[in-house]
């Protein structure tokens, strides 16, 4: 590009947990010599999933009811994670981390359990988990077609066109509040899904929508039904059913059932 940005598209490769090196060399236009080289080590080939939403997607594994057991088990699965900063800042300043006892506490609890479930069923496929979620946010902030799209521009667009396998979405509590017109969610959720897919340009990748569980918030039943109708209308949208879980806490303390 004129501003110096560039991109390389790699041919499809089979999934592999074999550590590899990516070597990037820059040529000096005056001498013709390759004088600037960057080496990225421990590169693996697998699936990358993006987790979006508000506080329940953002809440870290350290706060889960089964945190100790989950964290001690974190290194047993080939998971890597990337947390987008919650202030809409410079996404590029964030780095990938390897899931382990010393790092897993910072992972999204829902996304950890989702990734662990995938890893257990696809042991030969490395799993990368990107989480971009902000507490107390309405859906209109996550899609320009649904409203302001401010967080979409700040925390989702910079990730494009990062190759994704799919998206997990856990959001809707804010839109069920009494001061909100919850009926808009019937249009906002499918438009968000369509906008993300269109802007990524990778086809109709899967969306896994976490169903709003039992909780004492005004119009939660409307948001829950909007999630269901969106799921029924799109063969590439699936629902993670949670209505059968005990309790009515807006922040369920045990996240494993919400991630599988």
Predicted stretch roles:
Residues 1-260:
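Cell-envelope and extracellular/periplasmic
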